[in-house]
Amino acid sequence: MRSDKELEKDQMKEKTEHMCKKMKKEDLLLYAVTDRHWLNGETLYSQVEKTLEGGTTFVQLREKELDEAHFLKEAKEIKELCARYRVPFVINDNVDIALEMDADGAHVGQSDMEADDVRAKLGPDKIIGVSAQTVEQAVLAEKRGADYLGVGAVFHTDSKADVAEVSRETLKAICDAVDIPVIAIGGISKENVSELAGTGICGIAVISAIFAEKDIKKATEKLKSLTGEMVKA
């Protein structure tokens, strides 16, 4: 008779294989999170198009200001854009919008819907990301069906000034504690991304490091190159 540990290992292997059908670990290398604050006269669509041209591997639409009708319209347009580049596209927090416009998935925080409830709503084939700051949160999110974790803030960030920083030691401990991919988020830039080498993350999520730059495509290319080097180090 097989031990509980062996059964748990097989279940995790099956889960990981299923996750790989929805997305590859490499898709999380450079994860762009949109922010209307950095539009500077441009449209969100044009900004996302530029970062996709530069090689962004994953896009999250984070929208706190639009009403539902405009949010839905914008989400559908950006989903089609991401599909042209074969880049996964998820919605931040708003699971109902993700369901209605058939996004590739959703990303939720600790104060949002639990991962298993998101899974029940979106179905087995959608990507579910969960934010975590502790090993306990990370392990629980994995058990509840998360496909990947966003951990941070790893550096100080003005976009979420009230969020406590996650130490390098905690980031590494989280990566060691789970079998699903982990990305770091919060205050990451081309100047400090190399400091995350050796933690076990498979990529980074950024906002201003891409969208606050004058040349979004060039900034994306540079950051992707540096992140690739960091992950391999």
Residue ranges and their predicted role:
Residues 2, 12-112, 121-146, 190, ...:
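Conserved N-terminal beta1-alpha1 strand-loop-helix module at the mouth
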Residues 167, 184-189:
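Glycine-rich adenosine-cofactor-binding loop
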